[in-house]
């Protein structure tokens, strides 16, 4: 299979690339390196530096003939999206529409979208399945929902199929240590906790300790990035075999609280990991946990590496070098 990853130099993208490479697929990566790292791109990949907002660059790379496209090129900080909506609409929505229309033009008919559990918003029941209403509580989540809706329309109007993978919280690193480059400017909880443990930042801000959860801190569904990467392989195989659309959750179906992650990190790293408890963030639900039964049924996907110990241990391996320098 010949697969092109847009945004393939980022944290998730490099793990997805590795998964395709390890089964001897041909992999191209298109990235503007705004958050990804050139050093994390495997030498076996063909790298194209470019921006999805540049239609000519997108058209040129798609003209080289690909079986499938994986779209991971998006800004993803929910809080920032509320402060800078234009940044998110331009890159996430306009950029995606350029990519989708150019895929149609180039007759690349198999499209895998990196979507998000943020499309659901505040859960009205748990675990959250794909039939749950979509009502994003931040603009980032809206951009992902907007892309999904456009894919749905394009698939009806053109000969075009897609799988939208609604990730829950991606976490962890390749367990064999093949990814060593850190994510630039991480906003997600676990890399931030690791930066505190490694001495790269003074403390962790814990937003809210008065939620209706066992320890009062927010509960999320963390899924190991190696498991997420496998989901993209299975999605590509599904598209090439079935030529049908699919929207599925990728989550571990287990909830971990901020406090659990903090305690496990302290235990595994032996570091103090200072935490400061502050007010809740607007729009943050108390608990968000996935049902991934549809992904198992349609793709044969399971979260095999997503225990809190596996996630923290694999991430700490990568951050230990930084810890030695502090």
Segments (PLM) and residue ranges:
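N-terminal Rossmann-like NAD(P)+-binding domain of SDR-like oxidoreductases, especially those catalyzing
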Residues: 1-173
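Glycine-centered small-residue hotspots that permit tight backbone geometry or close packing
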Residues: 8, 36-38, 50, 79, ...
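Short, flexible, glycine-rich and Lys/Arg-enriched loop motifs at helix boundaries
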Residues: 38, 168-189, 199-220
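C-terminal substrate-binding subdomain of Rossmann-fold SDR/epimerase-dehydratase oxidoreductases
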Residues: 192, 198-326
């Amino acid at each position: 299979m010949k697969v092109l990853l847009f945004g393939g130099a980022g944290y998730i993208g490099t793990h997805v690339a590795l998964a395709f490479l390890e089964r001897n697929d041909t992999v191209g990566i298109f990235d503007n390196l705004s958050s990804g790292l050139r050093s994390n791109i495997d030498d076996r990949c063909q790298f194209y530096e470019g921006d999805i907002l540049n239609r000519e660059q997108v058209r040129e790379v798609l003209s080289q003939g690909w079986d499938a496209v994986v779209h991971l090129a998006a800004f993803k900080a929910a809080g920032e999206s509320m402060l800078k909506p234009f940044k998110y609409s331009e890159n996430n929505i306009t950029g995606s529409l350029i990519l989708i229309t150019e895929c149609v033009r180039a007759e690349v008919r198999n499209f895998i979208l990196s979507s998000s559990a943020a499309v659901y918003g505040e859960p009205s029941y748990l675990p959250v399945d794909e039939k749950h209403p979509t009502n994003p509580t931040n603009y980032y989540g809206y951009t992902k929902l907007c892309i999904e809706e456009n894919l749905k329309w394009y698939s009806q109007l053109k000969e075009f199929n897609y799988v939208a993978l609604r990730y829950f919280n991606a976490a962890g690193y390749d367990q064999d240590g093949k990814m060593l480059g850190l994510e630039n400017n991480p906003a997600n909880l676990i890399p931030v906790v690791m930066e505190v443990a490694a001495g790269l930042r003074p403390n962790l801000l814990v937003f809210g300790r008065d939620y209706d959860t066992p320890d009062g801190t927010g509960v999320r569904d963390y899924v190991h990035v190696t498991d997420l990467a496998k989901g993209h392989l299975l999605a590509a195989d599904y598209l090439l075999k079935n030529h049908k659309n699919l929207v599925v959750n990728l989550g571990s179906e287990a909830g971990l609280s901020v406090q659990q992650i903090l305690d496990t990190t302290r235990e595994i790293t032996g570091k103090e990991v200072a935490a400061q408890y502050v007010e809740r963030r607007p729009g943050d639900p108390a608990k968000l946990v996935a049902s991934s039964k549809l992904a198992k049924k349609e793709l044969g996907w399971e979260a095999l590496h997503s225990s809190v110990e596996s996630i923290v241990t694999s991430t700490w391996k990568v951050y230990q070098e930084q810890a030695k320098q502090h």
